[in-house]
Amino acid sequence: MGIARILSAVLFLSVLFVVTFPTLLSADHHDGRTDTCRLPSDRGRCKASFERWYFNGTTCTKFVYGGYGGNDNRFPTEKACMKRCAKA
């Protein structure tokens, strides 16, 4: 095997590692839930009153969202919340 082939293989493996490593770091935890589902409920900074759902660690719970800010643990329906966060 020539030096060019060895260098090509090393380059390919390096690029593969650089591309896949961040994906591995941000992958779902072992129980199948994403980091989003681990966030607390957060009604946001405004005073509107929108019905939303958040995952509380066990199930999806209704809360009032103020309309701006907050975090990503906020879903428009209980079904969407359960689909994303409930253990499979």
Curated annotation (Swiss-Prot):
GO terms for cellular component: extracellular region. Residues 28-33 form a propeptide. Keywords: Disulfide bond, Protease inhibitor, Secreted, Serine protease inhibitor, Signal. Residues 1-27 form the signal peptide. Residues 37-85 form the BPTI/Kunitz inhibitor domain. It comes from Cyriopagopus hainanus. Belongs to the venom Kunitz-type family. 01 (intermediate) subfamily. Its main location: secreted. InterPro entries: Kunitz_BPTI (IPR002223), Kunitz_BPTI_sf (IPR036880). The keyword Kinase does not apply. It is found in: Secreted. The record marks K47, A48 as: Reactive bond for trypsin. Disulfide bonds join C37-C85, C60-C81. This is Kunitz-type U15-theraphotoxin-Hhn1r. Serine protease inhibitor that inhibits trypsin at a molar ratio of 1:1. The keyword Phosphoprotein does not apply. It holds the Pfam family Kunitz_BPTI. GO terms for biological process: envenomation resulting in negative regulation of voltage-gated potassium channel activity in another organism. One of its GO terms (molecular function) is toxin activity. Expressed by the venom gland.
